[in-house]
Every structure is written in structure tokens, then in C-alpha cells.
Regions:
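Thiamine diphosphate
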Residues: 1-268, ...
Length: 268
């Protein structure tokens, strides 16, 4: 986007933003986006989940830059660095093993809690709601992991906005508790894990109709963290009310299992 005067001799200059496409270098795309954000504008980088690991160190340095910039009084807030990952580890029918690495979540998790946000929308409307939110934020690194293929649509737009605002909630229409104490909690985070949990509930309703199942979906991963450690985190009281204190919890998670352990090991 060219913001100053365009003269007759100029070529390939325009006043509208453009999509920079088909540059097979995450380094180049990440660097261009960071520079673009420094001009006060907005943007996002889209990459395969497995290959975003190429810019691990660049994102780490941007997180450090955000921290230091916030300490300088005359620095204005910058639009967030938004990272959208598709072609994720659960949809690799043609590429397979080489394209399966959800570890970028692990890479971001230890960063400063006032900088990092991680989202796992599970249908089109939750993705739209999530993207609408992150595009308005400042001074964050927002990670969104989502499918680029046709997927079931579970929520209306109104329901999706409500669910994403909470970040984590029971999918009451999928639960089989009928308002009673559950026998088991099935939790999920990510589009494919959510599909698998809902399929499991469907099977269990047929095979074990007496089983009371509570289904919980997590869009904002940092909700699982304690509110003492992350501003998005649930309080212990909120967590216990949602997940129960004495029922088995089966968690279907998009990434590596140690992420859930790290976020919840101090919970009830």
C-alpha cells in the first residue's frame, strides 16, 4: 500500500492493501508483516501448521519487542501479530507425516501472558467471531488454528459469538445430562477433536443411553490456565463448576497432550 503521491512515471503502486501470495518463505512473509504492522496498519500471516515452526525465533523476538515497546511512553500501540494456521496435523491425507507438527502452540505457551493468545475455533462461525475479535486487538500475538476444508457448522452466528466471548463452555445441546450431575466429562479443543467428541457422544447415546455425559468445548485455550497466571484464565471456582471436581475428564485436544497437562495440573 503506497500512502504518498503517485506520479506518472510510477509503476505497480496502489493505495489499497494487497494479498502477498505464493511466497514460499515464512521468513519473508513474517518479516514483511512485522514491518507492515510497524506502519500502524493491520494484517495477518497464513501458513501451514507444520511449517510455521520456521519462524519460531522471529515470533519470539516480536514478543520481546512488544514487551519493551510497551515500556516506552511515546510508543503507540500496534495492531496484533495475527497468525492463522491451516493444513493442520489432523487433515493430512495426502502429505502425511511430514506435515504433522502442532508444536507451535507449545512454542507460544511459555511467553508473557499479557502478549499471547491461542484460539481453536471449531466451525465457520466460531472462526469468523474469533477473527473479528483478534483483528481489533493491540499488542498481542494471536494464534488461530483452523481447518480450510468443508466442516460441519455447529453454531449459529449468535451462538458462536456468545461461545467465543466465554472462550470455554458446555455444549448443552450435545450433553446428555438433562441438568443432572454428569458421570463423565468429554472436553475438546480444535475442529477435528470436537468432531470426534461429538461422534463419540452419538455412539455412547446409542450404546449406553443411561450414561450422563457433559460436553465442554474450548475455543480460547488460555481459559484453562489459572486466572492468577493469565488474564483470560478461569478462577478455580469457575473451573470446578464447569469441569466438576470428582468426575473423570477425557480431553480430546488438537495438539500435544502435555499442553493440557501444563495448563491444568494445578486444578482440582
Amino acid at each position: 500500500k503506497w500512502n504518498t503521491k503517485i506520479i506518472k512515471q510510477d509503476e505497480l503502486l496502489g493505495r489499497n492493501g494487497r494479498v502477498i501470495d505464493s511466497i514460499l518463505s515464512e521468513h519473508a512473509c513474517e518479516g514483511m508483516l512485522e514491518g507492515y504492522l510497524l506502519t500502524g496498519r493491520h494484517g495477518f500471516i497464513h501458513s501451514y501448521e507444520a511449517f510455521v515452526r520456521i519462524i519460531d525465533s522471529m515470533v519470539s523476538q516480536h514478543a520481546k519487542w512488544i514487551k519493551m515497546a510497551k515500556e516506552i511512553p511515546w510508543r503507540k500501540e500496534l495492531s496484533s501479530l495475527n497468525i492463522l494456521l491451516t493444513s493442520h496435523c489432523w487433515q493430512q491425507d495426502h502429505n502425511g507425516f511430514t506435515h504433522q507438527d502442532p508444536g507451535f502452540i507449545n512454542h507460544l505457551l511459555p511467553k508473557k501472558s499479557d502478549t499471547i493468545r491461542i484460539y481453536l475455533p471449531f466451525d465457520t462461525n466460531t472462526l469468523i467471531s474469533t477473527f473479528d475479535h483478534i483483528s481489533r486487538t493491540k499488542n498481542y500475538i494471536n494464534l488461530v488454528v483452523a481447518s480450510k476444508h468443508m466442516r460441519p457448522q455447529w453454531l449459529t452466528m449468535e451462538e458462536a459469538i456468545k461461545h467465543c466471548t466465554k472462550g470455554v463452555d458446555e455444549l448443552s445441546w450435545a450433553s446428555t445430562t438433562n441438568g443432572k450431575t454428569p458421570d463423565v466429562v468429554l472436553a475438546c479443543a480444535g475442529d477435528t477433536p470436537t468432531l470426534e467428541v461429538l461422534a463419540a457422544v452419538s455412539i455412547l447415546k446409542e450404546k449406553k443411553p443411561e450414561l450422563k455425559i457433559k460436553v465442554i468445548n474450548v475455543v480460547d485455550l488460555m481459559k484453562l490456565e489459572s486466572n492468577d497466571k493469565h488474564p483470560h484464565g478461569l478462577t478455580d471456582k469457575e473451573y470446578d463448576k464447569l469441569f466438576t471436581t470428582n468426575k473423570p475428564i477425557l480431553f480430546a485436544f488438537h495438539g500435544y497432550p502435555n499442553v493440557i497437562h501444563e495448563l491444568t495440573y494445578n486444578r482440582t
